């Protein structure tokens, strides 16, 4: 029986990779998504991120370009894409996100046209089909940088 928490991470930038390493280190089953196939190929092949030199991504962190793979059946889903891509990513992922899903938003910023926070943007997009009324959506924020989290120093999640 596998008691690992399954976590999908939307976004393979420095935040996504730093959190993937940290969550994996703490015993969770992690899958990272990017919409860019070449990026996923490079991460899978090298097990490193170009902006986090010298930090190795464990072999058991999974990578995919498929939204259904990263979102379906996960205990927790993290949104770690740039703020400019939050709305489009939420819209694209919506069919694969079950109602009641725990979602953690780690993107920072305000949407210029609506002045919504990223968490509000995610909720707005997910609510458009009327089937995501019970999504548990939280924001994770604080005075940290992806590079610090990637170093795994003084952090326990």
Predicted regions and their residues:
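Rossmann-like NAD(P)(H) cofactor-binding subdomain of soluble oxidoreductases
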Residues: 67, 72, 76-152
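Short, well-ordered alpha-helix to beta-strand connector turns
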Residues: 27, 60-61, 74, 100
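Conserved small/polar residues in nucleotide/adenosyl-binding loops
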Residues: 155-157
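NAD(P)+-binding Rossmann beta1-loop-alpha1 motif at the extreme N-terminus of oxidoreductases
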Residues: 1-56, 62-65, 92
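Residues in flexible loops and secondary-structure boundaries
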Residues: 41, 51, 60, 71-72, ...
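Conserved short-loop catalytic and cofactor-binding motifs
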Residues: 31, 58, 106, 110
């Amino acid at each position: 029986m596998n008691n690992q928490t399954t976590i999908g991470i939307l976004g393979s930038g420095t935040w996504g990779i730093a959190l993937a390493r940290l969550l994996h280190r703490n015993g969770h089953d992690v899958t990272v998504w990017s919409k860019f196939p070449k990026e996923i190929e490079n991460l899978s092949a090298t097990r490193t991120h170009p902006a986090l030199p010298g930090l190795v991504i464990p072999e058991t962190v999974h990578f995919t370009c498929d939204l259904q793979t990263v979102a379906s059946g996960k205990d927790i889903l993290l949104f770690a894409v740039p703020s400019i891509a939050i709305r489009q990513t939420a819209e694209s992922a919506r069919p694969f996100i079950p109602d009641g899903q725990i979602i953690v938003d780690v993107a920072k910023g305000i949407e210029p046209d609506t002045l919504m926070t990223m968490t509000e943007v995610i909720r707005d997009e997910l609510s458009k089909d009327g089937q995501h009324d019970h999504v548990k959506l939280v924001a994770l924020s604080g005075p940290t940088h992806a590079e610090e989290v990637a170093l795994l120093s003084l952090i326990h999640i």
